[in-house]
UniProtKB/Swiss-Prot annotation:
Cell division among keywords: yes
Keywords: Cell cycle, Cell division, Cell inner membrane, Cell membrane, Cell shape, Cell wall biogenesis/degradation, Glycosyltransferase, Membrane, Peptidoglycan synthesis, Transferase
GO terms classed as biological process: carbohydrate metabolic process; cell division; cell wall organization; lipid glycosylation; peptidoglycan biosynthetic process; regulation of cell shape
Keyword Transferase set for record: yes
This protein's GO CC annotations: plasma membrane
Gene (name only): murG
Function text: Cell wall formation. Catalyzes the transfer of a GlcNAc subunit on undecaprenyl-pyrophosphoryl-MurNAc-pentapeptide (lipid intermediate I) to form undecaprenyl-pyrophosphoryl-MurNAc-(pentapeptide)GlcNAc (lipid intermediate II).
Name of this chain's protein: UDP-N-acetylglucosamine--N-acetylmuramyl-(pentapeptide) pyrophosphoryl-undecaprenol N-acetylglucosamine transferase
SUPFAM superfamilies: UDP-Glycosyltransferase/glycogen phosphorylase
Major subcellular site: membrane
Domain of life of the native organism: Bacteria
Catalytic activities: di-trans,octa-cis-undecaprenyl diphospho-N-acetyl-alpha-D-muramoyl-L-alanyl-D-glutamyl-meso-2,6-diaminopimeloyl-D-alanyl-D-alanine + UDP-N-acetyl-alpha-D-glucosamine = di-trans,octa-cis-undecaprenyl diphospho-[N-acetyl-alpha-D-glucosaminyl-(1->4)]-N-acetyl-alpha-D-muramoyl-L-alanyl-D-glutamyl-meso-2,6-diaminopimeloyl-D-alanyl-D-alanine + UDP + H(+)
Protein localization: Cell inner membrane
């Protein structure tokens, strides 16, 4: 079986595709998989690192900021060039099925596959369906979703509740606690907080955590902070307090398996895949929805969890005042940590990648 997986721009669209690809290869090593993404975006490095070939398209997303709205004038040209290029890719590769994981990067691929009468499966991660998937839904044979009620956006006869696919290491329950601490140079027996700003970073979160370094040291809490590449150089140049040896600042975490193994508490943006990965890793979490996303969809992802006592919510504008106190309070409350883990785990289906892979096999 030949499969094209297309989508990207952020980790939330890239990592589900990799998780699905991994299961398809496990099911049959003869399966051939090709990724198609947006040139210059993170998928162009992350997909090859996972062992799969990828082709980049010259596609660009819509710029919604008024002062940059003029940049959208060239968008039709990039779309046409991408459609022409992806038509050649499909003709040469001859896929049996095309999978779309969302984001503008997948739009030309899915649209052209539909025009060429190739079966299509879409995977929607969020509680609020993305623009690309809503536009492409009419071409899809099946639409795999993670939240109930998604027939509000898609034809109900196409919707399949599978959950969000997560990378395989998150379902591996091997005891990596001590190796993970050694990897990051941290001490055992101390509360470890993993802070993730999302694949594109989050400056307000990073700055609040760094400015509280002396507070964490006082409370014997160690921190792993992933700033994102965009903010790492800014943080390096800023005049922040000196950090103790148990404060690790990284632009990007290559070994997320070890980061989750080390963590007692996770602070994260509320992207759908981030939430699913934290649930699979069985960690108590504080979520800070990004205000810079379409239709405030990260808030929509996390609100159902808050109502079920499965997550702690802090709004982005509350970060300077509320984030550090919330971390300190949760670090002291073992019972609440256990409750959050149990409730979050119960909110999501497991083995989503396996379910989607089986659906793809049945479709072909």
């Amino acid at each position: 079986m030949k499969v094209i997986i297309s989508g990207g721009g952020t980790g939330g669209h890239v990592y589900p595709g990799i998780a699905i690809a991994d299961v398809l290869k496990q099911k049959n090593a003869e399966n051939q998989i090709l990724f198609v993404g947006a040139g210059g975006k993170m998928e162009m490095s992350q997909v090859p690192a996972a062992g799969y070939p990828i082709v980049g398209l010259p596609i660009r997303g819509i710029n919604r900021k008024l002062k940059y709205i003029w940049k959208n004038l060239a968008l039709p040209i990039w779309v046409l060039i991408s459609l022409w290029k992806v038509k050649r890719i499909i003709k040469d590769f001859k896929p049996n099925v095309v999978i779309g994981t969302g984001g503008y990067a997948g739009f030309p691929t899915i649209y052209m596959a539909a025009r060429m009468h190739i079966p299509i499966v879409l995977q929607e991660q969020n509680a609020y369906a993305g623009v690309a998937n809503r536009l492409l839904a009419k071409y899809a044979h099946k639409i795999c979703v993670a939240y109930e009620g998604m027939d509000a956006y898609f034809p109900s006869n196409k919707v399949v509740l599978t959950g969000n696919p997560v990378r395989a290491f998150l379902t591996d329950k091997a005891d990596n606690y001590l190796p993970s601490l050694q990897y990051f140079g941290l001490e055992p027996g101390i509360i470890t907080v993993l802070v993730l700003g999302g694949s594109l970073g989050a400056q307000a979160i990073s700055e609040s955590i760094i400015k509280a370094a002396h507070i964490f040291e006082k409370h014997t809490i160690q921190v792993i902070l992933s700033t994102g590449n965009a903010y790492f150089s800014t943080i390096q140049q800023a005049d922040f307090p000196a950090f103790n040896k148990n404060f690790k600042i990284l632009p990007y975490i290559e070994r997320m398996d070890l980061a989750f193994a080390a963590a007692n508490i996770v602070v994260s943006r509320a992207g759908a895949i981030s939430i699913a990965e934290i649930a699979s890793a069985q960690k108590p979490a504080i979520f800070i929805p990004s205000p810079n996303v379409t239709a405030d969809h990260q808030m929509k992802n996390v609100l159902p969890l808050v109502t079920k006592n499965a997550a702690i919510l802090i709004k982005d504008n509350e970060v300077p005042d509320k984030l550090v106190p919330a971390i300190l309070e949760l670090a002291k409350d073992k019972q609440r940590q256990r409750m959050l883990v149990e409730n979050l785990s119960s909110c999501f289906k497991t083995h989503a990648a396996e379910s989607i892979a089986s659906l793809i096999e049945d479709l072909v």
